[in-house]
């Protein structure tokens, strides 16, 4: 066994242990210093630092055992007094602790290691006990005065100030240590950590780059750089950095590979994400998270059957507390693409929204699914919920809502709602004809039936301003807009006829007949104008001779979503 520890210790040094302590990797520190003490049972410093690591981890009994071993290693050395002080500290005997440390300082007044170990006694404390930075600083400064070129003392001073926290003094000590060992990546990396705590992003990244420049395989710096870009949402840079980490790092974990896969997905390099995820799953199939990412990626590449299979497998294995809203979102999309299962897809979209209200934009997809099934009422409801949360609605989305409202047969107010919605389009894009046209179509549904109720003729005309706006816009390209222009001009010709406006009737009938010479409404009303027999229907008049039948309510064109 001693041979095994000796071989392990040969690969470990006090410098490795110092790095583990600086980085607060207590388990690694314990492993290193345990090996060092096994290889050299007389190494009091290793035992003392081993005890400090156990204390930092909250293992008071193990710390006591390490201190006892340190004393037994050399009972007559100055460090033995340090050991005694630490043991009395564990007993909260402040007076005796002070006595022992004074003896240690006197015996080792020119020994920077002894003085540093006294200082560290106040720095690494049991769980729940705050470090005494004043006493730690006192003895660490004494250690520095004993040997201003001692790298370990400078690093410990830097760590003490970092924890205090005093970023300026911490940086100063780490810079001095860096000057002593310019090829050592640790001081540079610790400086990066100081600048990160100070929220000096540029200096943080600069020192990470300096660390990597002298130690290209230094995993902690490679990982920190990738994470900095990732959490700053600079995903392209994060992807490059994660690639460097996975390719060059000396302690790469599966979590690092997973983060690279995630970054590849975010940057839309789906094939690369798929390749990496499948590689990781082959090594470790327990990472169910990766099945999610794989399913997402297959959807994005258009391989819907594979994506559906992966997500089915994922949901069979995942526990409910691990499911994300995006899981339901992608499952819904895959259900539509691979199976055409609209109803189940809608259920999953709703689960996603219920789980995460920030995914409210999915109501738009729900609305489109309902509309594709001609379920106009549910489509209208879903589009409305989507638009209620949109700060600045798009005209195309309002158009879809308006159509769904227009064709929702179960809503007695469908035409009023549709008219209001289409008018919002005219406010957004007043020079586009579509909003005016559909506002008019909705309004015509709300016009009085003057054939059945001639006394209501004066109330006819709700759609007039909308149709007039539409004609003004659409007449620029009469051939393209011919069908809807005919509908608009039929209405306007009839409106002016009802009002007894000869010139208005003539003008619109002329335009109508130019487009459609055989148009019955245009022919009849133009004849009435020419014959001088045009008599408007007025309230109280049961009818008027020669009054033509009003134009049929316009049938919406197929391009306008004519489903109902």
Q: What kind of feature is each model-predicted range?
A:
Residues 536-541:
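Flexible, disordered linker segments and immediate boundary regions flanking tandem C2H2 zinc-finger modules
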């Amino acid at each position: 066994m001693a041979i095994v520890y000796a071989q392990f210790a040969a690969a470990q040094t006090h410098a490795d242990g110092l790095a583990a302590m600086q980085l607060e990797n207590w388990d690694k520190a314990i492993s290193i210093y345990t090996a060092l003490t096994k290889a050299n049972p007389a190494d009091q410093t290793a035992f003392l630092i081993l005890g400090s690591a156990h204390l930092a981890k909250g293992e008071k009994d193990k710390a006591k055992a390490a201190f006892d071993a340190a004393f037994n290693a050399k009972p007559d050395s100055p460090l033995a007094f340090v050991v005694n002080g630490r043991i009395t500290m564990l007993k909260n005997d402040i007076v005796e602790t002070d006595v022992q440390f004074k003896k240690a300082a006197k015996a080792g007044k020119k020994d920077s290691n002894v003085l540093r170990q006294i200082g560290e006694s106040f720095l690494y404390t049991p769980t729940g006990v705050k470090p005494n930075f004043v006493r730690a600083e006192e003895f660490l400064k004494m250690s520095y005065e004993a040997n201003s070129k001692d790298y370990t003392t400078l690093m410990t001073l830097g760590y003490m100030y970092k924890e205090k926290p005093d970023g300026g003094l911490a940086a100063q000590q780490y810079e001095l240590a860096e000057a002593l060992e310019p090829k050592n990546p640790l001081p540079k990396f610790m400086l990066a950590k100081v600048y990160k705590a100070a929220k000096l992003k540029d200096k943080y990244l600069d020192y990470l780059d300096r660390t990597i420049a002298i130690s290209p395989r230094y995993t902690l710096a490679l990982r920190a750089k990738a994470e900095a870009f990732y959490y700053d949402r600079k995903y392209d840079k994060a992807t490059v950095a994660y690639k460097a980490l996975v390719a060059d790092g000396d302690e790469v974990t599966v979590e690092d590979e997973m983060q690279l896969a995630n970054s590849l997905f975010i940057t839309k390099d789906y094939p690369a994400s798929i390749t990496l995820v499948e590689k990781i799953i082959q090594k470790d199939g327990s990472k169910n998270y990766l099945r999610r990412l794989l399913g997402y990626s297959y959807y994005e590449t258009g391989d819907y059957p594979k994506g559906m299979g992966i997500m089915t497998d994922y949901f069979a294995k995942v526990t409910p507390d691990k499911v994300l809203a995006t899981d339901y979102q992608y499952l819904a999309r895959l259900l539509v693409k691979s199976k055409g299962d609209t109803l189940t897809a809608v259920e999953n979209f709703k689960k996603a929204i219920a789980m995460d209200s920030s995914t409210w934009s999915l109501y738009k997809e729900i609305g489109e699914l309902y509309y594709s099934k001609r379920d106009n009422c549910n489509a209208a409801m879903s589009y409305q919920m989507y638009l209620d949360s949109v700060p600045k609605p798009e005209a195309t989305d309002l158009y879809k809502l308006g159509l769904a409202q227009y064709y929702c047969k179960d809503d007695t107010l469908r035409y009023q709602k549709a008219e209001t919605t289409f008018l919002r389009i005219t406010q957004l894009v007043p020079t586009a004809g579509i909003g005016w046209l559909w506002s008019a179509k909705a309004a015509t549904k709300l016009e009085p039936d003057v054939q059945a109720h001639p006394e209501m003729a004066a109330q006819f005309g709700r759609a007039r301003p909308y149709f007039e706006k539409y004609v003004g816009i659409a007449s620029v390209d009469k051939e393209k807009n011919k069908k809807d222009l005919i509908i608009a001009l039929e209405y306007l010709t009839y409106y002016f006829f009802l009002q007894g406006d000869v010139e208005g009737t003539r003008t619109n009938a002329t335009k109508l007949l130019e487009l459609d010479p055989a148009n019955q409404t245009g022919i009849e009303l133009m004849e009435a104008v020419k014959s001088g027999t045009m008599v408007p229907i007025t309230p109280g008049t049961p009818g008027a001779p020669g009054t033509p039948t009003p134009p049929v309510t316009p049938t919406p064109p197929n391009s306008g979503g004519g489903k109902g």
